Amino acid sequence: MPQLATYTYICAFLSAIKEQIPNVKIFHSGAKTLSVAAARVGIETVWLYHGLARKQSKADFPFLDHIYVYSSEEKTYFEDISPNSNVCLYPLKELSTLEKKVIIFLTRLDIRMSEKTLSEILTFFLKKDYQIFLKKHPTYTGSLIDKIAEKYNLEIIDHEKDASESILSLRPSFTIGWGSTALCESLRHGVVPISLDDLDTDFSWAIYPFKKRTLSWKDEKERIFELLKDMSLYTKTLSELRVR
């Protein structure tokens, strides 16, 4: 009953807004009840996904006029469960030239990052003369990243820049991180993404096949080593990651 009361209130609230602003649109990142109410009163809705999209129940997925997602897999998925919605990919530019740089996208909690793994991968790329940049999660409040940046004399990217902006401005050859849309965006930009997730990390909830679309530092280290030895394999590696 509390949900019904909330829904009724939202419908009344949105109806009042529509009377004042007939062409009003609602942009949100997952407000299902709001979406249902908006559709009922005839207000256009736009769902802007932030993060990897979760699988949904077709039975209770609300009607949305527009859905914006990061990957072609997500686009196909939502076109299937919501055929009357206009599903769009966020526009991303593929880079034609890359530089000898690496961006590491960090998680929001120190406890989810292994200092040992970070040190291992930093040492590896620094020995190969790559310039490495760290990108903090927008909500990060820990101390590990500053400690690592100081230890290895690394630059931390301006927190105002999002993942795509960082990739476009630095043009790295590799991006590194844990389960994140940053690595999905990286592949679309034409930059090889490397995952630091443990092999048993569960991504079954996600539409995007994250493990298939990244090189695993834990499971494909030798392949990464070979790629660094022979960068002529780069284009082939990108192509394989996009379809495997």
Sequence positions of predicted segments:
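Active-site and donor-binding regions of nucleotide-sugar-utilizing enzymes
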Residues: 1-82, 89
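Conserved acidic residues
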Residues: 23-25, 65, 101, 171-174
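Structural motif
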Residues: 27-32, 50, 69-72, 105-110, ...
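Short, charged, surface-exposed secondary-structure boundary motifs
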Residues: 54-64, 77-81, 96-100, 164-169, ...
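Catalytic binding pocket for nucleotide-activated donors in carbohydrate/polymer assembly enzymes
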Residues: 64, 82-85, 181-242
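Conserved catalytic-core segment of nucleotide-activated headgroup transferases in glycan assembly
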Residues: 88-150
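Donor nucleotide-activated moiety binding/catalytic core segment of transferases
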Residues: 139-189, 193, 199
